[in-house]
Amino acid sequence: MMPRLQQHKIILRQLGLQPYAPVSQAMHNFTEFRTDTTPDEIWLVEHQHVFTQGQAGKAEHVLMPGDIPVIQSDRGGQITYHGPGQQVMYVMVDLKRAKIGVRQLVTAIENTVIETLAHFNIDSHARPDAPGVYVEQQKICSLGLRIRRGCSFHGLALNIAMDLEPFQRINPCGYAGMQMTQVSALQPGVTVADVQPVLVREFTRQLGYPTAKLQPWSLSDYLLSSHSSSSVL
C-alpha cells in the first residue's frame, strides 16, 4: 500500500526542450544540496537528440550512433535514446521522508504510465524481467533511477510523438531487436502537451501527494559555481 503524502508538497517544473548534459548536472546538484525540508520535485523535459548509457550499459549495445552523441549516465539500466516528442519526467523524491523503498517507487512510476496510457485508451503493462512499460511486446516507456542519500533522481521517458528511428541504432535497454512504439502510433494526434497533465496527475495520485505546484525553472539556479560538478551524468 502506498503512503499518503498530503502533508508533503511537490513542485512541478516545466523545462521545455533542453540538452541533456546541463539538465542532468542541475538534477545532480539539486539532489546533492537538498535538505530534509526540501520539497520533492517533478521535472518535465524533452531532450535534444542523445543516447544515454546507464550504469549497466555495455558498449556492444551501441550499434551505429552516427551523429547522435552518446553520454554516460549514472542512472540504472543500459542504453536508451532521448529526443523531441518524448516526455522525460525526472522524479526527485525523498524516499526516507516518504517512507517508501525503491521497489515501491518503481512500481508507482510504472503504474503512473499505465494509468496515463489508459486515459488515452491504450492498454499497457509492466514486465518483471525488464523495467519499463510495454504495449503487447513493444516498449513505450523506459525507466531508470538512481538513489543518493535516500533521495531519487532520474526517472522515466515516455515515447509520445517522436522519430523512433534512432532506437534502431542501439539495442534499447540492452535487448537486441527490442521493438519500440509510441502514443501517437496508437492514438494518432496525441501530443506531449496532451499527455503532460495526465502524467503529473497520475504520479501525484500514486504517491498520495497534493496537486503539484507549478514553479518557474532556470538552469542558472542549479549550475552555480559553488555547486561542485560531476563527470558522470
UniProtKB/Swiss-Prot annotation:
The kind of enzyme this is, by top-level EC class, is transferase
Can the keyword Cytoplasm be found in this entry's annotation? Answer: yes
Q: According to its UniProt record, in which pathway does this protein act?
A: Protein modification; protein lipoylation via endogenous pathway; protein N(6)-(lipoyl)lysine from octanoyl-[acyl-carrier-protein]: step 1/2
A further note on this protein reads: In the reaction, the free carboxyl group of octanoic acid is attached via an amide linkage to the epsilon-amino group of a specific lysine residue of lipoyl domains of lipoate-dependent enzymes.
Task: Recall the taxonomic lineage recorded for the source organism.
Answer: Bacteria, Pseudomonadati, Pseudomonadota, Gammaproteobacteria, Enterobacterales
Gene Ontology biological process: protein modification process
The gene behind this protein is: lipB
UniProt protein name: Octanoyltransferase
Keyword Zinc-finger listed? no
Reaction(s) this enzyme catalyzes, per UniProt: octanoyl-[ACP] + L-lysyl-[protein] = N(6)-octanoyl-L-lysyl-[protein] + holo-[ACP] + H(+)
